[in-house]
Amino acid sequence: MQMKMKTVVVAAMAACGMGAALAQSTPSKVELWGVVDAAVRHTTNEGADKGGLTKLIGGGMSQSRFGINVEEDLGGGSKAIAHLEHRFNADTGMKDDTAPFFQLAYVGLQGPYGRLTMGRQWNVLFDVVASTYASFPYSPYMDAYKPELGMAAGARTNNALKYTLATPDRKWVGTLQYSFGEKNNTSSVQQYAVGALNASTNPQVAAVRTALGGQYTAGAPIKNIPRLGNAVQQVINGVVQTSADSLSDPTGLKAKVEEVGMGAMKTFGGFLRYSANGLSLGAGAMRTTLPGGSDLDAYTFGGSYRSGLWYFNAGYGLNKYKPTKYANRVDSYINYLTDRQILNKMWSGQTNGGFSGGYFENAADKRQMIKLGVGYQATKQLNIGAHFFRAKQSGSSDGTYNGNANFMVLAADYAFSKRTDVYAALDHTKVSGGAGLVIDPQSKAKTRTGITVGLRHRF
């Protein structure tokens, strides 16, 4: 249930002696809404000692957030719409340092001609899964454990145009998406990497630096001297991997790579959905061009069925990575590695894809996932659900990152009211295959179990 704050801005204008006639001729509404979710979560195999970790997290079933929805009636069945959404961690009150202040921010028009929106929005991959074959009937996904989002190419897109058209009965819904890259490139990453090479005390790197005339540049060759060029490549690998693994990063490269990864990327895609008589079917596809020139092609299809108290869903996702080809130059290699890191961030982490895809020339370039789930409304207030995900990764030249991953979660949600509920969930992750397949680089664990208990309120 959302708290409606009727025409706050118009009322303020009227109080100043302005806009009364406008308020009467153009009905509008402003809604302030939000979700506050906090949970205690315990996980195993954490850190180098592979111990247990118990902590309070700022979102177990849903990420805490608040937002503003605006609608203005333009007449003739048309209306203007705007949406702002800020996400935060309820345990600390802080926003996520790696995310923009507004996770969603868009404006648009809606009418008989369809719906056109512009801004930072959910991408079409997320849209089709969340609206058609979501993991749980009471929540599209569990925020503390969401391997399905690792296949959604970041889930949100900056600088996006989206056009949606539906049949009058909304049995058929289709959306097209295009976004602009807008000068998001790797130049800042190259600058920091060159600085690291020039500051390195590694004897081999210093020897190559001397052979290059005493200084590395973005256009400097990285393999021009036998037996020494590989050392330069390894230094670049180390700097980029350090940032990717969230370890110590004295060069400041970590922040630059994350900044590039959060920036606008060129995308094009769409989805189509059919829904009637409890059955929903959908499919979507999207290409993302990364800042260094690589392409990520993502596809998904699936469906769900509701019958009485039961909810069933199944889906398939495919990510195919097409890396940029790099020449024998520092800048070209940085482009290659930066794109790899951005992809790996999409694929990694126990809550978002579950295991590493690799950073370097032996990295994987293909990931597939199937998902199967069931939900049951045991009572008017109690919902239970179970979900299984199976992922397969391939394309690693030496097999280091080839393998499989299983994700399982059992969850129960009890509603005290329409706005307040309590939930509990048990999840388990297991990866197998090449030596590089780990849940996280700190623990290098291949299995992990989590228990989450939380409280959520919506207003």
Where do the language-model regions lie?
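Gram-negative bacterial Sec-dependent N-terminal signal peptides
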Residues: 1-24
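Residues that define the transmembrane beta-barrel architecture of outer-membrane proteins
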Residues: 54-64, 100-103, 112, 155-159, ...
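Outer membrane beta-barrel
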Residues: 25-42, 53-183, 273-277
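Detector for outer-membrane/organellar transmembrane beta-barrel domains
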Residues: 229, 250, 258-407
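Outer-membrane beta-barrel "beta-signal"
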Residues: 414-416, 445-459
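Transmembrane beta-barrel strands of outer-membrane/channel proteins
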Residues: 36-40, 84-86, 120, 176-180, ...
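Repeated loop/turn-to-beta-strand initiation elements of outer-membrane beta-barrel proteins
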Residues: 78-80, 113-116, 169-176, 278-283, ...
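Outer-membrane beta-barrel architecture
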Residues: 67-69, 106-108, 162-164, 271-273, ...
